[in-house]
Amino acid sequence: MAYQSEYALENEMMNQLEQLGYERVTIRDNKQLLDNFRTILNERHADKLEGNPLTDKEFQRLLTMIDGKSIFESARILRDKLPLRRDDESEVYLSFLDTKSWCKNKFQVTNQVSVEDTYKARYDVTILINGLPLVQVELKRRGIDINEAFNQVKRYRKQNYTGLFRYIQMFIISNGVETRYFSNNDSELLKSHMFYWSDKQNNRINTLQSFAESFMRPCQLAKMISRYMIINETDRILMAMRPYQVYAVEALIQQATETGNNGYVWHTTGSGKTLTSFKASQILSQQDDIKKVIFLVDRKDLDSQTEEEFNKFAKGAVDKTFNTSQLVRQLNDKSLPLIVTTIQKMAKAIQGNAHLLEQYKTNKVVFIIDECHRSQFGDMHRLVKQHFKNAQYFGFTGTPRFPENSSQDGRTTADIFGRCLHTYLIRDAIHDGNVLGFSVDYINTFKNKALKAEDNSMVEAIDTEEVWLADKRVELVTRHIINNHDKYTRNRQYSSIFTVQSIHALIKYYETFKRLNKKLEQPLTIAGIFTFKPNEDDRDGEVPYHSREKLEIMISDYNKKFETNFSTDTTNEYFNHISKNVKKGVKDSKIDILIVVNMFLTGFDSKVLNTLYVDKNLMYHDLIQAYSRTNRVEKESKPFGKIVNYRDLKKETDDALRVFSQTNDTDTILMRSYEEYKKEFMDAYRELKMIVPTPHMVDDIQDEEELKRFVEAYRLLAKIILRLKAFDEFEFTIDEIGMDEQENEDYKSKYLAVYDQVKRATAEKNKVSILNDIDFEIEMMRNDTINVNYIMNILRQIDLEDKAEQRRNQEQIRRILDHADDPTLRLKRDLIREFIDNVVPSLNKDDDIDQEYVNFESIKKEAEFKGFAGERSIDEQALKTISNDYQYSGVVNPHHLKKMIGDLPLKEKRKARKAIESFVAETTEKYGV
């Protein structure tokens, strides 16, 4: 294909949208946008307005009601009816989007709308529905990284999207050959929320032309916004559903409304089944002929989790049942179309209250069953089915049962539910970036071949548990974990789970960790959890303790660490606290390794969990479920889920991946070999050297295009290094990869310097640079051990009596500061340099370095505020008040800001506002740690 400019791509899209049924209109500025909105509003409400279009005052009143709202509030207004008082005191209800009859909305498209707020901006393609800009399309020419379009959207949203542009629901970005969509939000836009569109078979629809044909047809787009965008009430965000979620819901709705048959949805673990099942439940509960939608879960811990998730998507949508009598009441309450309960409670309700549920012998009911492969489902399903004669059953699972991994009674998922309505496999999810792939290691803990409990070649009399839990082996495994944990978890940036074969094994490992932990400079935070049996078998006297006693000790250790007060009488609360702890991964206050037998291996999602240690036998669905705890997408510093097996589960892993990805090619799911990544590194390193042969030559680059080439080349190199570090054989030496760590740190310093320069220029100047929208992927560069706390620890160790040693300490700190990659540390770099150069030499052994540094920072902060206030002729105390508010709220108080700036010309006012906001944000970060 010949070279195609961005302008040509935009024009081609405008022509295509016109052919699809959009009215092409010319709107160049905000006034024309408002005029067009007003005209359409009057046309759509002609009957309600009784031939009297909105007057200027009435329209202004309306704008006052709908303008200046958050994106979240604007999304709610869009889907609601708004009462407007007319000049004659009558009231009329206005609507902005027909969410049921999608094709009855008015569809328009325009391009090159110009706005000027703090910065000038011109938007590529704007789709208007009923006059409101609901979809914004940003384009880049072919060959440009699509992430640049994403970063441009982020910049525009921060600087320019005001007024009616607050009603944008969705962004579409494309470079012609790659296209993504994502929802608008008040919070930070995340790359992980950019989605591909696909067909029903999960084949990507990438080109802009085919994307527009499939996704942007007027009725389809209105349907997507109306039905398949979710207003998350808890987090106050907008969520766009992914294509496979949409297709699954459509297939399930069709099966439920057009047939009497059952079905199941196979969507891989971590792909968002809860949202899919909620949307299906919600739509079905609105059907007149369906009397009740009952969402069944199998376990108590998942019950509360599902309820919490459902209520996020529609506040108050779920009435959780606490006991069977309440469940019976809710089943008979016609005002409750949707109920979430457990299958155990449902079975009990039928057994004890069948006469109260007579109506459901004939009424149409839909059951939606989460994780429908659960072992208890089979028997209880038969009982429920006997009572609900006119019911349909729809299952959701990430790991269905097939003949090779059928349930205990020999049945498969298809035997219970019938046809599979939609599939989205683990290979699809990894390909789309919705979950991560796996890096799997197999550590042989025996000198000879690895032992397997089911190995028929072993003499039957051998006590395999005795072999697996031999003191020497347990210590070997524990030491391997301790020695490698920081590498696997990026210096404890992430947490891990260690799954073992039995409660006895768990106790033994916990005690070994506890003993070895005492010798570590930085001890690991270890926790253990299991369910004890009140009347426990003592295994013929082999184990001289009751497991409850050991759990009590683990809980006591946990209480000391986290200042809690749990016991074996409050194990549910202990479980919930651990769950929140592992999910949040709060820095310096989190669990590093959670030891379990089976708990937390299914139905538990944590983005900050990246490593699973395995010392037990796993197969098929159990293996995939366990591995999948590690593969939730977080940020660039988490490129895969790390699995460390202390048993030879290679065959089991390959078999499970073959079954659940429906392919023999597992390369798309598992990381490639070390040699492949090493070759990739060599190629990237050569490319970097061709652009800038040495790190210091980056300083000589004048041309922005050349600087951009350097950024892109080093960014690729850094990504490969991140993957290489996951391999035990990796050594950061010239002999191994042709580059040593020092050279990498030097290149990284230059890379971060370019990032800081671009960030500063963006904040201070109304200037557009080609580097503004480059994705620097800063999170990938961070080494969390080298931060402000790390430097402060070195400062505390400075020998104030031995001047020669003091100079060595100072030089060490300077070297570290030169290569700082922690954002806050880079902000403090000059402060710390000045402190060690000017203050430290004057201190003696009686001085408190911590206090001296606090005093030094306080003086510098005071001077910085005084200087900024004097330079801009603003009140210093008012500036400090704004800064203090920002420190606690994260928001610059607009009322205080307006008062402080005073009466300035509009352009000057914007400049002053921007400068103050930047100053407050930077000084808060600089002096806030």
From Swiss-Prot:
Any one biological process term the GO annotation gives: DNA restriction-modification system
InterPro entries referenced in this protein's UniProt entry, alphabetically: Helicase_ATP-bd, HsdR_RecA-like_helicase_dom_2, P-loop_NTPase, Restrct_endonuc_type1_HsdR_N, Restrct_endonuc_typeI_HsdR, SWI2_SNF2, Type-I_R_enzyme_R_subunit, TypeI_RM_Rsu_C
Residues binding ATP: T268, T269, G270, S271, G272, K273, T274
Protein family according to the UniProt entry: Belongs to the HsdR family.
Function, in words: The restriction (R) subunit of a type I restriction enzyme that recognizes an undetermined sequence and cleaves a random distance away. Subunit R is required for both nuclease and ATPase activities, but not for modification. After locating a non-methylated recognition site, the enzyme complex serves as a molecular motor that translocates DNA in an ATP-dependent manner until a collision occurs that triggers cleavage.
Reaction(s) catalysed (UniProt annotation): Endonucleolytic cleavage of DNA to give random double-stranded fragments with terminal 5'-phosphates, ATP is simultaneously hydrolyzed
GO molecular function (one): type I site-specific deoxyribonuclease activity
Keywords: ATP-binding, DNA-binding, Endonuclease, Hydrolase, Nuclease, Nucleotide-binding, Restriction system
Enzyme class: hydrolase
Top-level taxon: Bacteria
Other facts noted in the record for this chain: Type I restriction and modification enzymes are complex, multifunctional systems which require ATP, S-adenosyl methionine and magnesium as cofactors and, in addition to their endonucleolytic and methylase activities, are potent DNA-dependent ATPases.
EC number annotated for this UniProt entry: 3.1.21.3
Protein name in the entry: Type I restriction enzyme SauMSSORF170P endonuclease subunit
Organism of provenance: Staphylococcus aureus (strain MSSA476)
Every Helicase ATP-binding domain range: 254-418
Subunit structure: The type I restriction/modification system is composed of three polypeptides R, M and S.
